Amino acid sequence: MKKYLISFLTLVLPFITFAQETQETGIDQQIDKAFKPFSDFFSDKIFFLVWKDPDIPFVLVLLVFSAAFFTLYFKFPNIRHFWTAISVVRGKYEDIEKHGATILYGEDGIAQGVDLNKVDDIEEHIDNIESLHSDLEIDGDIKETIRDESSHGEVSHFQALATAVSGTVGNGNIAGVALAIALGGPGATFWMVVCGLLGMSTKFVECTLGVHYRDVGEDGTVYGGPMYYLTKGLKEKGFKTLGKVAAVLFAIFCIGGSFGGGNAAQSNQATIVVKELLGWESTAAGFWIGVVIAFLVGIIIIGGIKRIASVTEKIVPFMAVLYILCCLYIILSNFSLLDDAIALIVKEAFNPKAIGVGGVIGVLLVGFKRAAFSNEAGAGSASIAHSAVKTKYSASEGLVALLEPFIDTVVICTMTALVIIIFNFGGFFEYGGDGSGSVFIDGVAYEGAGITSIAFHEFIPYSKIFLTIAVFLFAVSTMISWSYYGLQSWKFLFGRGKKADLTYKVLFLIFVVIGAAASMKSIWDFSDAMIFA
């Protein structure tokens, strides 16, 4: 621990010196000025257009059509296997792992209709089983069930889901939704939901592949993700060189994504709400908030995936439920406006009124872009976390993964959107704003999480305090998960040694500070580019 603390202080001290030297011009402005050309370069290169007026980037078309293809090819797994996925996460099959199929279920267990949930003493029940019904099993497994044999892996299905959800449920749900509505109007919500439903199939595919082609180290540590399934999968198909090149490119951009959308964008939004709550107008406020966040994240990410799973398993359900309850309170308190809000979402999805959105295609692109950023379906990042699950049945974890876009986009993003739309029935701002994502409320410019914050404050007294805490928790949990994604890609490129680990973590913490200090536009342009790449 001491050496990590020394490394962190070595990282921070030069920034402190730089901060003292730039008090007059403002360190936040200096960092933003230095970072903007870097952000613009990547944004221009990644989002090259296949069509102009409206602008349609190739990468967005690729993601959407891939999701539609997987949905049709696998016959709507997002609908047919939804309840099976919930059963796996709930641990329905844990008794099978603990006791074994041949012992747990026999003629007295299933054939005679005994409900094991109502058995007083399951151990006594097992002891009393004298005969088995062989027709119920195939190679020791019960028919029509999924068995978690724990042959390899580090975490449970639920922990893998929590780690991955914490990477998707973040400020894309709070700030991203507000940005989508500010730019595209209420209709953007409809297309976000559509993208989320299609994205469930994409998550199913990429996480199944992640488990199927994962590597297991000599010490039992699991390494997985697109860099592994691209290499192995394409090699099996006779495209060895293409697989290696694709894997290296993914690893590079995944590292970029961990610095951008999974890091800088999160600290950026956390800083915005903290500054607004505290009324901190200092030209170095973002920098110092970033230093604090970097310190907290640095302590957590030293633990590795097992500690990340432990932390996110506790944080994610709590913050998601609390945030949803607040959204529900606002929505139900204004229940008479709910049907109007839903009608407006559907109407403006096909007949948008937002200033400068560019018609149906424009609002569709806004919704799809923000949904893809929020749930990361197609980005491949979630398969890194899911590859660490304890199972030898890859498809079972694919089923678990398809729940993520539903939780993230269909549920949480939609609730955020309804709160903002109901709030704006009071005519507080014009949809479309100035075209940059900012809107003016009572003459004051608001953007991202700031829009959501003022909407909450209208209905819940002192909600700015709650939302600041929620944004902060979402940000930290997302950064924790993305640090793991980026580190796995870093190890793929540079090896699995301790020095490689430390180098990545130092760079990761630097981007926490950059994200907090730089402007929202620069950070989100860079983040979008890295996630979509």
Label each PLM-derived region with a short phrase:
Residues 2-164, 183-186, 533:
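N-terminal alpha-helical transmembrane segments of multi-pass membrane transport
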Residues 3, 70, 74-90, 246, ...:
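Membrane-interface loop-to-helix entry segments
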Residues 21-22, 206-219, 327-344, 352-354, ...:
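Extracellular/periplasmic helix-exit of transmembrane alpha-helices
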Residues 53-81, 91, 182-221, 413-415, ...:
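Extracellular loop-to-transmembrane helix junctions
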Residues 70-71, 165-166, 195-220, 231-268, ...:
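Helix-loop-helix module between adjacent transmembrane segments
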Residues 89-99, 141-161, 196, 207, ...:
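Transmembrane-helix boundary/entry motifs in multi-pass membrane transporters
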Residues 108-180, 218-233, 255, 359-406:
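Alpha-helical membrane segments and immediately flanking helix-loop junctions
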Residues 195-206, 289-305, 316-336, 369-370, ...:
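Selective recognition of specific alpha-helical transmembrane segments in multi-pass small-molecule
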